[in-house]
Structures are given as structure tokens and as C-alpha cells.
Amino acid sequence: MGYCGTGAGMEKVTRGLEATVSRGPDDCRIIDLKDGVLGFQRLSIMGLTPEGMQPFELNGNYLVCNGEIYGFEKIKSELISKGYTFKSGSDCEVLLPMYKEYGTDMFAKLDAEFACIIYDSAAHEFIAARDPIGIRPLYYGYDAEGEIIFASEPKNLVGLCDKILPFPPGHYWKDGKFICYRNISEPERTCH
């Protein structure tokens, strides 16, 4: 869950996450950033050590992700050859180094099902993204102050946002806009 603003975000994220404790019963972490708040409830599947707990951090940037990154071992090896180090066996830990290398172009490079939120500390901005098919859920809404809030389930946003909307698959949100990075209704190749 991510609150992209400075008005009582910690309280809002805490309240929102309480609605889905059963979804991530293994651990919960909320971090208060300069420009907002990120919260994560953990269901330990991969990277079962404490180091696999999110939000992940790299050079002041943070990430929460509900996802499965296919072939992450190959991506991880490529990133290690570029000097990156990893603390856990979690597949999602490769995402922040990918963001550092490729920026938002990383989303089109992924073979994955995911819903993620990145905090870029240098730009003081949040970026949210969802896989092209929309396998992993992601919703958003705006609070009374007009700040956007993202969550994996609509019930995380009930009472925080007047209107709750599904995040469009194959898009990322940055600078207040949704940007399509992959439209599966327009295939790049066809078979004959």
C-alpha cells in the first residue's frame, strides 16, 4: 500500500492495512518517507528470511511489490555482474536495481505478474505499476486532500477514498499520469 502525500499518511496506511491482515499474516512494515508512506503485509513465499521483508531499499529508493518475477535468477545474475548485491532470495529484490538501470522502461522488460510501488528519493516521487494482463490486483483512489493512494485490495481504501478504481493493467503511474507501457490488445507479432 502506498500513500503519495504528506497529510496524515501513516495513520491512513495503518488503517488501510488493518483491513487485510489475513492476506499477509507473517509480518507488517510501514515506513514514513519524506513524501509519503509505504506499507507492506508479508505472506512469506520466496525469500523467507527477514531480509526478504519489504519495503526493499536501495540508495534511498524504496519498493513494495506483490508479484512473481519469472526468470529472476537470470536478471539477478546480470545485475550482480554490474556490481549489485542482494540480501535475500526474494525475486522482487531485483526490481530496485532494475529501476536504477532502466528507469520506467524496466516494466516492459519484465516477464512477471506484479503490482508495485516505487519511491524515487532523488526525484521525490512515487511510481506505481501493474503487469500487462492485470494478474496481480492494484487499486487506487484519492483522499479528501486530493492525494493518490494505492492498494492491493479495494477494502484497503474504503473510508480513505470516495471513489476506488482498478489500476489499468500494462500501465505505470508517474507525475500524476497513467502511462501505457504494454497494450496486450495490440500484439507485436502475429502467427500465420
Segments predicted by a language model, with ranges:
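Cysteine-centered catalytic environments shared across enzyme families
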Residues: 1-192
